[in-house]
């Protein structure tokens, strides 16, 4: 299980990753899962243990292109994506 932060802007995705990196949060840029309706093809993947810190950082930034946070659960049958915020 991991979490994804979705944005409607590639530049905002890169900016958010830089901010998370600067705060010591391990994250990576991934292709946005098709289940997430976003105008941008890139999202930020991060660990479940960092969810509260990432939510706090996003609440301070308040990016206008922020789509939401999503929980991604994968198993041998596929994946389930749930919007959490």
Regions found by a protein language model. Name each.
Residues 1, 26-46:
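Amphipathic, hydrophobic secondary-structure cores in small proteins
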Residues 10-26:
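Short amphipathic alpha-helix segments
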Residues 8, 15, 31, 35-37, ...:
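Generic, ordered loop/turn and secondary-structure boundary motif
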Residues 52-85:
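C-terminal structural segments of small proteins and small subunits
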Residues 9-12, 47-52:
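Helix N-cap motif at beta-to-alpha junctions
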Residues 3-6:
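Short glycine-/aliphatic-rich beta-strand segments at the starts of folded cytosolic domains
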Residues 17, 40, 55-57:
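Short, glycine/acidic-enriched capping/hinge loops at junctions between secondary-structure elements
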Residues 22, 37, 62-65:
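A generic structural signal for short, non-catalytic loop/turn and secondary-structure boundary residues
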